[in-house]
Amino acid sequence: MKLNEIRDNQGARKSRVRVGRGIGSGLGKTGGRGQKGQKSRSGVSINGFEGGQMPLHMRLPKRGFNNIFAKDYAEVNLGAIQKLVDAKKLDTAGVIDHAALKAAGVARGGKDGVRILGKGELTAKVSFKVAGVSAGAKAAIEKAGGSVEVIEVVPAAEKAAAKKGTAKAAKKA
């Protein structure tokens, strides 16, 4: 058998049926949709509509809320950091911050900065400047001879507002 001789098994792929193309095809006129009515018409059905019965999403109770003050951290584990150090993708000589972790491809998203978590082992002596750190991670970093500085990350909107305010103050003076 050669690559050009490979075929699908019999009946593995069904050919597309062209409905509504004459009575000789067996699927002409109504195209397998029955007679008149809402279900015979074209267009997408209404999502979640159950024929007038109360839909499931309305039968179930409301639950929870969206906390507008919730912090969005990019969470990075110590094991992932150690792997990057071993692969020489992270420089341990300087301070490791959000930008360095993002460049290394380990911190994705996180508009409020990076939070380091304690999963995995860290043997390298590393100093961090991050938005958050768990107690276990802090202990492991200090045990390895490193240090952690927790900084407050100012959101972009607040930075822009502060910058705009200083520009206005400079204009007045």
UniProtKB/Swiss-Prot annotation:
Keywords: Ribonucleoprotein, Ribosomal protein, RNA-binding, rRNA-binding. Residues 1-50 are annotated as: Disordered. The keyword rRNA-binding applies. One of its GO terms (molecular function) is structural constituent of ribosome. One of its GO terms (biological process) is translation. Residues 21-35 have a biased composition (Gly residues). HAMAP family: Ribosomal_uL15. Binds to the 23S rRNA. This is Large ribosomal subunit protein uL15. It comes from Rhizorhabdus wittichii (strain DSM 6014 / CCUG 31198 / JCM 15750 / NBRC 105917 / EY 4224 / RW1) (Sphingomonas wittichii).
